[in-house]
């Protein structure tokens, strides 16, 4: 729904970030795909369009309970090396370079229509317990995996949505979701860079 700083085919200026430059995430780390079925960098696209919009954790059942950082070996994952997370740094398609603040850092990648599609694209890193994000004011902040992220089973904000899913509404994904919106009147009191 174009709630973040970077929106395809749109021009956004600092003056458009009404939630405040220090309250808005501009970018974040992404862990590069190593070919090891890691949920943070190997996209799972075994999900339907409405599934992922209505339930951002729709891919969670495909996570290996014995190795919770990996997809089950029975899950069919795209294996083209050229389509790995972070492999095409200048490509604007979500899987390659984008993040969103739906699920907390280091959560699973769940997409529809492969690397050129849309989905849940949390930032990720090899750091223990979190990742770095770039705030719109230029500050770099380490955000923990345990950041308050609201109800991860709540549907996402979408064009034509109603209630807490309507464009312009506050994020249903708690503090984490609020940090990802630029103009939803979601200012925060917490100090992030301490």
At which residue positions do the language-model features occur?
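Hydrophobic alpha-helical interface faces used for helix-helix packing
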Residues: 1-194
């Amino acid at each position: 729904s174009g709630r973040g700083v970077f929106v395809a085919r749109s021009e956004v200026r600092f003056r458009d970030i009404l939630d405040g430059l220090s309250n808005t995430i501009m970018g974040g780390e992404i862990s590069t795909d190593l070919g090891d079925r890691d949920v943070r960098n190997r996209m799972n696209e075994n999900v339907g369009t409405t599934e992922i919009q209505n339930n951002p954790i729709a891919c969670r059942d495909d996570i290996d309970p014995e190795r919770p950082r990996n997809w089950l070996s029975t899950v069919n994952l795209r294996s083209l090396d050229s389509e790995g997370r972070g492999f095409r740094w200048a490509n604007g398609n979500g899987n390659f370079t984008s993040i969103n603040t739906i699920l907390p850092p280091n959560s699973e990648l769940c997409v529809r229509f492969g690397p050129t599609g849309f989905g849940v694209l949390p930032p990720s890193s090899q750091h223990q317990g979190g990742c770095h994000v770039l705030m719109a004011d230029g500050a770099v902040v380490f955000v923990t995996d345990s950041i308050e992220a609201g109800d991860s089973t709540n549907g996402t904000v979408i064009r034509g949505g109603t209630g807490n899913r309507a464009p312009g509404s506050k994020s249903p994904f708690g503090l984490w979701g609020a940090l990802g919106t630029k103009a939803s009147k979601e200012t925060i009191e917490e100090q992030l860079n301490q």
